[in-house]
Amino acid sequence: MRCPHCHKNGSRVVDSRPSEDGSFIRRRRECIHCGFRFTTFERYEETPLLVIKKDGTRQEFSRQKILNGIVRSAEKRPVSMERLTKIADKVEKQIRSIGESEVSSQIIGKFVMNELKGVDEIAYIRFASVYRQFKDVDAFMSELETMMKAEHKK
């Protein structure tokens, strides 16, 4: 690694520590030429993940798109932004745990709906209405009835 002080290549690792969440490693380094100490942060490189859309086109996965959809569905609902961000994080983790380089948008939608269902039913219905593209009111009512039956069983 190039020293930020003398700009020569060559350093040794003095100390390594993982972050609290394990997403990166903090390393203290010392230049073997001038003795200057500096810190680096290393992240693992994720393999690109492609989403297969309904029309068959492929698009690079975007966590931000998921978060935007979740935020839109929970608009004016008593759900904190922190909670919505955690949902997006959990969905991304589920998608990546599949271990495939491509995943269908239907699978992503199901993961999001599963998470929203346990957090806010109105946000769930809003998301489902866009995701499932209900053809008519009957299809929408059928989903509501299914949800209400599940609620009464609790």
Curated annotation (Swiss-Prot):
Instruction: Check the record and name the PROSITE patterns matching this protein.
Output: ATP_CONE
Disulfide bridge positions per record = none
Please cite one Gene Ontology biological process associated with this protein. Answer: negative regulation of DNA-templated transcription
Note the superkingdom of the native organism: Bacteria
Q: Matching InterPro entries, A to Z?
A: ATP-cone_dom (IPR005144), NrdR-like_N (IPR055173), RNR_NrdR-like (IPR003796)
| Keywords attached to this entry | ATP-binding, DNA-binding, Metal-binding, Nucleotide-binding, Repressor, Transcription, Transcription regulation, Zinc, Zinc-finger
Cite the cofactor comment: Binds 1 zinc ion.
In Gene Ontology terms, what is one molecular function of this protein?
A: DNA binding
- Which cofactors are named for this entry? Zn(2+)
Pfam family, any one: Zn_ribbon_NrdR
Q: Where are the zinc fingers (unnamed)?
A: 3-34
Q: Which residues form the ATP-cone domain?
A: 49-139
Q: Which family does it belong to?
A: Belongs to the NrdR family.
Task: Report the protein's function.
Answer: Negatively regulates transcription of bacterial ribonucleotide reductase nrd genes and operons by binding to NrdR-boxes.
Name by which UniProt lists this protein: Transcriptional repressor NrdR
The species this protein was found in: Limosilactobacillus reuteri (strain DSM 20016)
